[in-house]
């Protein structure tokens, strides 16, 4: 039987993102968004258990057998790190292994806009990177933390479940805490965080009221705080944070959020023309006008404010990003339309031949044929 390291080696060779192990099928690898089967026979329940247990510690085995679910990460020297979620399905063990490259990619390599570097340079406040699972949030955050690590002399504290990218001490002192290995829970780690003299705090996932409340408090007390949510737009992100609190607290939370928020980056990965994937970004920077809209519970007006904040503040809506990617011939029209939540607006943008690259205008020259053109 093929070993787990051999299968993970194949993930790297194929430039894949995930390895799926489950019964009654060969292992499958996600490559550029699509699952591909590995040559070989279907796996039995005994084989999936043997394969997945091969990298577990005794403590991890015990935890999995008690809860029937397990999140952890591990590294294979010279290859990469992997994040794993193990679970039971139809009474058998299954698992998904997500590739985490050993090398942290920088802003230029990821083609991230300058406004994200500006967010990483903030002395304090709350920066949120959001999007669905597998949209590259961890990769973007790793680039931002790496920039801080190289350029500042501060204490970076991360709380993750599990640790994905490993940051070495560079200009900064870096402490990375993994839930279950280094702390019992996010809430325990966050309660202790302010006693650990941090300057920058990364919260791997803002899952519940206590975690969100802690993030706001840490940002409010003068720390640069990064967090993630599974939301798809800036407005949805703000609403999600406010709605997690009881109704009687929401007015206070709107005010608190309006004061500490420094940026929201919502991202999605799309199939790239010619192979691979490319990131689409919605970026919101809270101007005084936007802070006022948050305070006054006029979240629905933020979208218009973002559209007019392109050149000066580096903001862009998701549709502006999609239009730009299409006009630069990086994605197909079908991909752009599939990813858009307002196809009529996107079609109009493309017909006008107008796009924006995070604060820099994209001219009409070289734009593909507008929608509806013959």
Tell me what each language-model feature is.
Residues 1-374:
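Short, flexible helix-loop junctions that flank or precede catalytic/ligand sites
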């Amino acid at each position: 039987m093929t070993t787990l390291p051999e299968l993970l080696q194949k993930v790297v060779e194929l430039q894949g993102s995930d390895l799926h192990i489950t019964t009654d099928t060969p292992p499958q690898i996600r490559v550029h968004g699509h699952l591909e089967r590995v040559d070989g026979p279907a796996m039995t329940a005994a084989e999936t258990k043997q394969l997945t247990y091969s990298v577990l510690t005794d403590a991890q085995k015990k935890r999995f057998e008690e809860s029937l679910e397990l999140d952890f990460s591990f590294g294979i020297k010279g290859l990469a790190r992997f994040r794993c979620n193990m679970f039971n399905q139809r009474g058998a063990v299954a698992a998904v292994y997500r590739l985490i490259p050993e090398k942290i990619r920088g802003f230029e390599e990821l083609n991230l806009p300058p406004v994200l570097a500006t967010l990483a340079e903030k002395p304090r406040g709350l920066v949120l990177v959001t999007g669905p699972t597998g949209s590259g949030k961890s990769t973007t955050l790793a680039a931002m933390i790496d920039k801080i690590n190289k350029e500042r002399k501060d204490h970076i504290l991360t709380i993750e479940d599990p640790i994905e990218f490993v940051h070495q001490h560079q200009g900064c002192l870096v402490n990375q805490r993994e839930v279950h290995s280094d702390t019992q829970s996010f809430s325990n780690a966050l309660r202790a965080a302010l006693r650990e003299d941090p300057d920058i705090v990364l919260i791997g996932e803002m899952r519940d009221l206590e975690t969100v409340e802690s993030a706001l408090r840490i940002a409010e007390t003068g720390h640069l705080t990064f967090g993630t949510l599974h939301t798809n737009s800036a407005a949805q992100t703000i609403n999600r944070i406010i709605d997690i609190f009881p109704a009687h607290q929401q007015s206070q939370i709107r005010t608190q959020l309006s004061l500490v928020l420094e940026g929201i980056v919502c991202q999605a990965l799309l199939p790239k023309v010619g192979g691979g994937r490319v990131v689409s970004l919605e970026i919101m920077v809270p101007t005084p006008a936007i802070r006022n809209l948050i305070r006054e519970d006029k979240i629905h007006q933020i979208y218009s404010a973002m559209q007019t904040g392109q050149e000066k503040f580096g903001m862009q809506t998701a549709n502006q990003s999609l239009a730009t990617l299409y006009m630069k011939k990086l994605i197909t029209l079908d991909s752009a339309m599939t990813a858009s939540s307002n196809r009529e607006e996107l079609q109009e943008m493309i017909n006008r031949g107008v796009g924006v690259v995070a604060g820099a205008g994209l001219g009409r020259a070289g734009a593909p044929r507008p929608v509806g053109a013959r």
